[in-house]
């Protein structure tokens, strides 16, 4: 419809809005189905040996491109050790990183974001996503992993319904890892 020459600018804007809302609804349904399968122990994990360094850089590049196309001026700065390999479900890792990066971009207020990936003690892989944005209040931090919880109630709408961090937590734990947050209001958050 958007390519239809007969549509007036206002009609094209309305069609574009409808398409965006449909995409948001599709994302929400996919997240709910994922978490439902996880609750029932039916969410499959298909691990394979993956170069996390290259995969993380690819995800960062895609998210940077999307952010720039939406007018976000901040840069994603990478500190990624080369050749970090691990047995992971590539699709779930991508989903986890996109959730963390999209949150950092959304709440980072256009400031730079830092992504790091390193190995400690020869086997522990540590990944971090840090923004310098609005941060999370101390009172909200214990609840951010809960489904549908939104620390920033003033930012509503879109496809952001408070499921992303519960998915991040599930994915990390399903791979034998964990996720934590350090945050201070007005200074940003690090996951």
Model-derived features: positions:
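Short acidic helix/loop segment immediately C-terminal to the autophosphorylated histidine
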Residues: 2-9
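Short alpha-helical segment of the dimerization/phosphotransfer core of two-component systems
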Residues: 20-25
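Short helix-loop "hinge" at the ATP-lid/N-box region of the Bergerat-fold HATPase_c
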Residues: 104-105
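Conserved micro-motifs of the catalytic ATP-binding
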Residues: 10, 40-45, 85-88
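Short conserved segment of the HATPase_c
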Residues: 136-148
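Conserved catalytic submotifs in the C-terminal HATPase_c
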Residues: 46-49, 73-84, 120
């Amino acid at each position: 419809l958007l390519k239809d020459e007969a549509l007036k600018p206002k009609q094209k804007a309305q069609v574009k809005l409808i398409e965006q809302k449909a995409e948001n609804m599709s994302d929400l349904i996919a997240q709910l189905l994922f978490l439902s399968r996880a609750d029932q122990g039916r969410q499959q994990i298909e691990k394979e040996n993956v170069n996390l360094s290259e995969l993380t850089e690819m995800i960062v590049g895609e998210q940077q491109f999307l952010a720039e196309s939406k007018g976000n001026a901040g840069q994603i700065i990478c500190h990624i050790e080369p050749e970090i390999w691990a047995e992971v479900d590539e699709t779930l890792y991508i989903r986890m990183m996109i959730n963390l990066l999209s949150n950092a971009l959304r709440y980072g207020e256009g400031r730079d974001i830092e992504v790091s990936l390193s190995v400690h003690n020869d086997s522990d892989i540590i990944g971090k996503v840090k923004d310098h944005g609005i941060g999370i209040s101390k009172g909200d931090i214990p609840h951010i992993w809960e489904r549908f919880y939104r620390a920033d109630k003033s930012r509503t709408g879109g496809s952001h319904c408070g499921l992303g961090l519960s998915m991040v937590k599930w994915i990390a734990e399903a791979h034998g890892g964990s996720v934590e947050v350090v945050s201070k209001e007005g200074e940003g958050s690090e996951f």
